[in-house]
Amino acid sequence: MKRNNLSSFYVSLWLLFTATMLQAVESAKGKYAQMLFNELFEDYSNALRPVEDTDKVLNVTLQITLSQIKDMDERNQILTAYLWIRQSWYDAYLKWDKDKYDGLDSIRIPSNLVWRPDIVLYNKADDDFSEPVNTNVVLRYDGKITWDAPAITKSSCVVDVSYFPFDSQQCNLTFGSWTYNGNQVDIINSLDSGDLSDFVEDVEWEIHGMPAVKNVITYGCCSEPYPDVTFTLILKRKSSFYIFNLLLPCILISFLAPLGFYLPADSGEKVSLGVTVLLALTVFQLMVAEIMPPSENVPLIGKYYIATMTMITASTALTIIIMNVHHCGSEAKPVPQWARVVILDYMSKIFFVYDVGENCTSPRREKEQEHRLEGGDMCRGGDGKSHLSSRNDDSDLKENLNGNWNKSFGVHGENVRENVNCCSCYKMLIKNIEYIANCVRDHKANRAKGIEWKKVAKVMDRFFMWIFFIMVFFMSVLIIGKAA
């Protein structure tokens, strides 16, 4: 028991001694750091370029880390990004011998105390010209200064929406010195591309790279070169949102348009369906126009909307024409022979359009009806002949009756005269029946003419329905193929 207490006592003493030594070291470090700071900045000025020889070029190493894409405003063509900007350079006046300061090799001081390169974003699209964030810099014993500063940048980005919503964008971030030329400050990119290791995944865009390229430009105003480093941010749009909210509804609505040809002409809704679909697509077109920049490049989905709206307009116009054909009455001319052969004989069989009571197993029904009608006409012709013969018989009968009337002047002659009057009544009845038969015959002919025109309209409906279905299908495949 005493042995355990003794060991615990020694452990406590060791921990106390270690903590005391660390505190002494820290206080010594702090003492040397304060001494070093006072000696370094006693005669230091951050207004001048920190080189011993003014003809010497000061190299500034630049590294960009992309943390997050905050916004991509396609309409105003502005990219808002959250960056970590690391700059490092050597200050010839901020060096020390670390052995004289108890091995102190680096200190952290506010960045506004040292000279800083005036590197700015050339293609900045922000109205706020605020100064850089005043974060600390790391100052090493050999004079190397490392300055890490966060920045929310708004840069101009030329947006090409030709393949929206399956588009890819390339946005440039160009950094360079605002006042120093290449003979005074040279910019060197530390990596061949921007650092994407800490990138927070965006819900709308995929990052496919951020290559960096150094450019040396000579402007017309000056003969000195001006270097800059351009980081090209390659973005690929995630199109699922736009597919389910803009493209897929448009495709479904487009397939509704050809069904207007399948509606019965007497329903009165054929034109209404086309106009309703056209208005729905107009709403989607306006939604796309609100988010796209007003440029001459029409997006792919916009072209699809325009093509679909043109197709629906054509289908509505054809529907109106076909409805006029459908409602041709007795005043219309008969169906032309070419239309009878092409539309009624061939196309009606291809598109399975038959009369009431007719199906695909009885294609000769019309011919049989024609044969029956011709037979009926022959019978009616026979009736006409019998009527003519009966009329001749009546005249013969009248002559005989007149002869008998002259021969006999008795009661028998009066009976014969009554028979003649009855024959006259029969003749009037026959004339009335013939008139009624002619009216019925004309009515049937006009009705058959209207039925033929209705069948022509129905065949045209089926024909254009399949034509427009094929057009919608190929348009949908075309837009998906272009996206791929």
UniProtKB/Swiss-Prot annotation:
The keyword Transmembrane applies. Activated by a myriad of ligands such as acetylcholine. AChR activity is inhibited by the antagonist alpha-conotoxins RgIA and GeXXA, small disulfide-constrained peptides from cone snails. One of its GO terms (biological process) is monoatomic ion transmembrane transport. One of its GO terms (cellular component) is postsynaptic membrane. Its main location: membrane. Forms homo- or heteropentameric channels in conjunction with CHRNA10. The native outer hair cell receptor is composed of CHRNA9:CHRNA10 heterooligomers. Found in the stoichiometric form (CHRNA9)2:(CHRNA10)3. The chain crosses the membrane at residues 241-261, 271-291, 305-325, 463-483. It catalyses: Ca(2+)(in) = Ca(2+)(out); K(+)(in) = K(+)(out); Na(+)(in) = Na(+)(out); Mg(2+)(in) = Mg(2+)(out). Residues 326-462 are cytoplasmic. One of its GO terms (molecular function) is transmitter-gated monoatomic ion channel activity involved in regulation of postsynaptic membrane potential. Disulfide bonds join C157-C171, C221-C222. This is Neuronal acetylcholine receptor subunit alpha-9. Residues 1-27 form the signal peptide. Component of neuronal acetylcholine receptors (nAChRs) that function as pentameric, ligand-gated cation channels with high calcium permeability among other activities. nAChRs are excitatory neurotrasnmitter receptors formed by a collection of nAChR subunits known to mediate synaptic transmission in the nervous system and the neuromuscular junction. Each nAchR subunit confers differential attributes to channel properties, including activation, deactivation and desensitization kinetics, pH sensitivity, cation permeability, and binding to allosteric modulators. NCBIfam families: LIC. SUPFAM superfamilies: Neurotransmitter-gated ion-channel transmembrane pore, Nicotinic receptor ligand binding domain-like. Residues 28-240 are extracellular. Keywords: Calcium, Calcium channel, Calcium transport, Cell membrane, Disulfide bond, Glycoprotein, Ion channel, Ion transport, Ligand-gated ion channel, Membrane, Metal-binding, Receptor, Signal, Sodium, Synapse, Transmembrane, Transmembrane helix, Transport. Residues 364-395 are annotated as: Disordered.
